[in-house]
Amino acid sequence: MAFNHKHLIDITEYSEEDIKLILETAKAFSEVNERAIKKVPTLKGKTIVNMFNEPSTRTRSSFELAEKRLSADSLNFGGSSTSTVKGESLVDTVETLNAYKIDCIVVRDKHAGAPYIVTQNSPASVICAGDGKHNHPTQALLDLYTIWEHKGDFHGLKAVSYTHLRAHE
């Protein structure tokens, strides 16, 4: 089965088969963490920008570490270190990134819909790493992965969601 999606913006855009493929791929890569040398050439030659315009510890460090272990070249910036503090718009920032011919932009922003705006203004793949209270598909996938690892299946399960969204206000 092939994965035919360019972006990861909203988990509801994916079929059950897509999600299973993502989880199975993650499991296959998880063994890299057990190696003495925790690096594979999967993304060698690819450039990823982590544009975190909202504070993040776990999500940002997880992306940065995964990119390094998959041999991607990455650029990390956001918030007060960008020209947005001088009034530059998200679209202007994305247009600058487009000039660098990057392959993927990981977006974390407090504004709902920001990752979607990036998809409309860049040829690069876009991954939503959270957009305020709106969406956090990578967290949803991590939660599903944990359930899948422990239960082996999602069918017939009831779930309660407790979040720390107040921290994102």
Residue map of PLM features:
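Phosphate/diphosphate ligand-binding glycine-rich loop within oxidoreductases
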Residues: 37, 41-148
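Positively charged, low-complexity intrinsically disordered leader regions
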Residues: 1-48, 53-56, 61
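Glycine-rich helix-loop-beta junction characteristic of Rossmann-like nucleotide cofactor-binding loops
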Residues: 150-152
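Nucleotide donor/acceptor-binding cores
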Residues: 46-48, 156-159
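Conserved small/polar residues in nucleotide/adenosyl-binding loops
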Residues: 163-169
